[in-house]
Amino acid sequence: MVWPLPKKLIAAFFRKVKKVIVVEELDPFLETEIKAMGYKVQCGKNFIPAIGELSPSIVKQSLTKPVEGKRYQAPKVRIKSEDLPRRPPNLCAGCAHRPLFYALKRLGLYVFGDIGCYALAVAPPLSAMHASTCMGAGIGGAYGAGKVIGKDGLGKICAVLGDSTFFHSGVTPLVDAVYNKGYSTTIILDNGITAMTGQQEHPGTGYTVHSEPTTMIDYEQLAKAVGVKHVRKVDPYKVNETMEVIREEVNRDAASVIITENSPCILLRRAKPLEKFKSPWYAIDAEKCRGCKVCLGINCPAMSWLEGADLTKDGHKRKGIVLINKDQCVGCEVCVQICKFEAIMPGTK
């Protein structure tokens, strides 16, 4: 979505063409705004569906008659979509959200999530998010569930939301949780950027939307300012330490906040996220791997499974082994920490 509308750019475009087609999903937002500027849109929602997701074939089917003046003829389908390999959306290799949600799953917490990359934690094998309604609803949901259902209803409860979501609509429900004596734990995932929707700045990055240095709002000070007495920080890449801090905070009879640190978005180049990792990539020791698949539980895209009954060097049976793609691995060491058999080691050239 482009807003504010680039009116000069649109005007320059209209001067170069004879007809304009506006293709957008759902409501005719851009189309309406362009018409309000006084321009004529030949094809828009009068031909293109206003519901559902658009695809090249749907757009072509919708515009063939008004643009080309002939009926649309569907091409022969060579490959059916259901026959294509499935590739569900996933967190990036090395993403700090992955070990955090792995820790939450290990602790068996009921997690109220929010809107961001971390919403992918709802899917297996992580399956570590149980509710996600709308932006900013995580903290209110966790606090409200604790008040209405009680501690015996859902068990230990926590809310998880990203840094930009916290500034957008997370402060108010945190105030409510403190004011109304809630006891839920809020985890703020500070990855230094608005990651999912385009790498925009926010009040916690230290830069304006024009990339100018500005005041960086401190999460810890803000949480304490609204009355949260228990605020702690964790490095999510240190799985056991993170689990211990979360375990302590969810057992408090008061609202608490945990902030992740040293965990910038893996795509945020200015933060140099890869410099903290000791090795550029890791590999599986085929002699030690038992094929237990525990490491696959973090759902890292750099890891895959090689099927095939086999024996380890010391005679243990296994159904296969895990493989690590060195071109995708960034060396975050999360898999190293959870492997019981020390079968993951720094890669060599």
Label each PLM-derived region with a short phrase.
Residues 122-259, 267-271:
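Thiamine diphosphate
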Residues 1-74, 260, 345-349:
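Terminal amphipathic helices with adjacent charged low-complexity linkers/tails
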Residues 268-269, 290-325, 334-349:
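Iron-sulfur cluster-binding cysteine motifs and their immediate structural context
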Residues 75-139, 148-151:
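Active-site diphosphate/adenylate-binding microenvironment
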Residues 4, 28-30, 48-51, 118-120, ...:
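Short gly/pro/ser/thr-enriched loop/turn and capping motifs at secondary-structure boundaries
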Residues 22-24, 41-44, 71-74, 93, ...:
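General beta-strand structural signal in soluble alpha/beta enzymes
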